[in-house]
Curated annotation (Swiss-Prot):
It is found in: Cell inner membrane. This is NADH-quinone oxidoreductase subunit H. It comes from Erwinia tasmaniensis (strain DSM 17950 / CFBP 7177 / CIP 109463 / NCPPB 4357 / Et1/99). NCBIfam families: PRK06076.1-1, PRK06076.1-2. Pfam families: NADHdh.
Length: 325
């Protein structure tokens, strides 16, 4: 066929990759939302959702149908364009970051030489969804949530990036495949344990998950920045949160736990098992930890996490210089 040129084939492959990433990541996030509700019920000694389907297995479908048929109402006092744009950014920002995560040595959306920088850019973009939602809603609780999000992001984005610089220094590259290959003999979690801890903390904060969910604290801000959202717009915020958890969990596996590497089992299975473990850790953190005060969250970021990150970076630089001599 004359129209099937190499350029057209490249476009078709890119579209197929994008659709696969979309359906797989959103499907994992949807499964996690159901698993979270069941596990929280187990942790809190209650049943959890168990009415729709066998063992509550169709509860997610029922929730999606309910959300789909709810009125897509936009308050008259909002900025309609920004109000509509905010949930789209929340859904797509960390979903795009998943494109740079290699599932195996050949399965990935995009093999970028600046892959890690692309993730940091998308993580910084995600906060604009919260800012747009809080500002455009013209609601004092939404605006307070947006202000909290901007200040919290300013604090935690600093050591989110610095916690990864030790990994980059050891691998000598921002490319995700190169970082995984550099862990063939020793996973980065051992020499970069402080970087691993601070990246996990910053990852929870980037996803606005408990205990760093101050921008949407129900007891203080009545659900915060998405108080005026309903229907599918609220659904995009909801799904975007779980997409962020999947992306951060996959990045933890790639950067610190050898990615797809492991004995006996196929690489895809190893990657899926490791990622699922850290997704479950997000749920356990929500069940086990209380929500601290907002000033305590900010102090913890600047006074504890940032010094630990700088200490890890200095130690990594010293080791690299010593071994190079």
């Amino acid at each position: 066929m004359s129209w099937l040129t190499p350029e057209v084939i490249d476009v078709i492959i890119a579209v197929v990759k994008a659709l696969v990433i979309l359906f797989v990541v959103v499907g994992c996030g949807a499964f996690m939302s159901f698993g979270e509700r069941r596990l929280l019920g187990l942790f809190q000694n209650r049943y959890g959702p168990n009415r729709v389907g066998w063992g509550g297995s169709l509860q997610l479908v029922a929730d999606m149908i309910k959300m789909f048929f709810k009125e897509d109402w936009i308050p008259p006092f909002t900025d309609r364009v920004i109000f509509t744009l905010a949930p789209m950014i929340a859904f797509t920002s960390l979903l795009l970051a998943m494109a740079i995560v290699p599932v195996t040595s050949t399965w990935m959306g995009a093999d970028l030489n600046i892959g890690l920088l692309f993730f940091l850019m998308m993580a910084g973009l995600a906060v604009y969804a919260v800012l747009f939602a809080g500002w455009s809603s013209n609601n004092k609780y939404s605006l307070l949530g947006a202000m909290r999000a901007s200040a919290q992001t300013l604090s935690y984005e600093v050591f989110l990036g610095l916690s990864l610089m030790g990994v980059v220094a050891q691998a000598g590259s921002f490319n995700m495949v190169d970082i995984v290959n550099s862990q063939a003999h020793l996973w980065n979690v051992i020499p970069q344990f402080l970087g691993f801890l601070t990246f996990c903390i910053a990852g929870v904060a980037v996803c606005h998950r408990h205990p760093f969910d101050q921008p949407e604290a129900e007891q203080e801000l009545a659900d915060g920045y998405h108080i005026e959202y309903a229907g599918m717009k609220f659904g995009l915020f909801f799904v975007g949160e779980y997409v962020g958890i999947v992306t951060v969990s996959a990045l933890i596996v790639t950067l610190f736990f050898g990615g797809w590497q492991g004995p006996w089992l196929p690489p895809v299975i190893w990657f899926a098992l490791k990622t699922a473990f850290f997704m479950m850790m997000f749920i356990l953190i929500r069940a086990a930890l209380p929500r601290p005060r907002y000033d305590q969250v900010m102090s913890f970021g600047w006074k504890v996490c940032l010094p630990l990150t700088l200490l890890n970076l200095l130690a990594t630089a010293a080791v690299i210089l010593y071994t190079a001599q």
